[in-house]
């Protein structure tokens, strides 16, 4: 038997699912790769005014080591125990 309330709720669920999938596709489609260079090279060209367009850049070199970092409740059962990491 046809129940309009059930049809309405399924319609809302289907619309919500469609909207969620479209939003997820939009977020995934705009994701990109972040790339950075260690050198600071910039210029403020054709900037009218005394304080407009001033560029100050400071290159920061921090060695980051992310291999083998885990969080465990019991440290003796750490799955990364014995791993060796090097900074290239």
From Swiss-Prot:
Which cysteines form disulfides? Answer: 67-85
Q: Which gene encodes it?
A: chpF
Q: What is known of its domains?
A: The mature protein rapidly forms a predominantly amyloid fibril beta-sheet structure at pH 3.0 and 4.2, with less beta-sheet and more random coil at pH 10. Reduced and non-reduced peptide have the same secondary structures at all pH tested, suggesting the disulfide bond is not required for fibril formation.
Q: Which organism is it from?
A: Streptomyces coelicolor (strain ATCC BAA-471 / A3(2) / M145)
Q: Which InterPro entries match?
A: ChpA-H
The segment(s) forming the Chaplin domain are 47-87
What high-level taxonomic lineage is stated for the organism? Bacteria, Bacillati, Actinomycetota, Actinomycetes, Kitasatosporales
Can you list the GO cellular component terms from the UniProt entry? Answer: cell surface; extracellular region; pilus
From the UniProt record, give one GO term of the biological process aspect: cell adhesion
Give the record's subunit note. Answer: Homodimer; disulfide linked. About 20% of ChpF isolated from cell wall forms disulfide-bonded homodimers.
Q: Which UniProt keywords apply?
A: Amyloid, Cell adhesion, Cell wall, Disulfide bond, Fimbrium, Secreted, Signal
Task performed by this protein: One of 8 partially redundant surface-active proteins required for efficient formation of aerial mycelium; the short chaplins assemble into a hydrophobic, amyloidal fibrillar surface layer that envelopes and protects aerial hyphae and spores, presumably anchored to the long chaplins. Chaplins have an overlapping function with the surface-active SapB peptide; chaplins are essential on minimal medium while on rich medium both chaplins and SapB are required for efficient aerial hyphae formation. Chaplins are also involved in cell attachment to a hydrophobic surface.
Protein location: Cell surface; Secreted, Cell wall; Fimbrium
What is this protein's record name? Chaplin-F
Q: Which residues form the signal peptide?
A: 1-36
Explain what induces or represses this protein's expression: Not expressed while still submerged, accumulates during aerial hyphae formation on minimal medium, no transcript detected during sporulation. During aerial hyphae formation and early sporulation on rich medium, under control of ECF sigma factor BldN. Expression depends on bldB but not bldA, bldD or bldH (at protein level).
What's the practical application here? Answer: The small chaplin mixture (a cell wall extract of an rdlA-rdlB knockout) forms a stable coat on a number of surfaces (including Teflon and cotton) and emulsifies oil-water mixtures, which could be useful in medical and technical applications.
Q: What happens when the gene is disrupted?
A: A strain deleted of chpF and chpG makes rodlets. Deletion of all 8 chaplin genes on minimal medium leads to severely disrupted aerial hyphae that collapse on the colony surface and are not hydrophobic. A few spore chains can still be made, but they have neither rodlets or amyloid-like fibers. rdlA and rdlB mRNA are down-regulated. Deletion of all 8 chaplin genes on rich medium leads to a reduced abundance of aerial hyphae without rodlets and occasional spore chains on surface hyphae.
The family classification in the record reads: Belongs to the chaplin family. Short chaplin subfamily.
């Amino acid at each position: 038997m046809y129940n309009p309330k059930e049809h309405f709720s399924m319609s809302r669920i289907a619309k919500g699912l469609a909207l969620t999938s479209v939003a997820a596709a939009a977020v995934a489609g705009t994701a990109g790769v972040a790339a950075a260079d260690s050198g600071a090279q910039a210029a403020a060209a054709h900037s009218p005014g005394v304080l407009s367009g001033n560029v100050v850049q400071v290159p920061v070199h921090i060695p980051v080591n992310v291999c083998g970092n885990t969080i465990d409740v019991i440290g003796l059962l750490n799955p990364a125990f014995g791993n060796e990491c090097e900074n290239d």
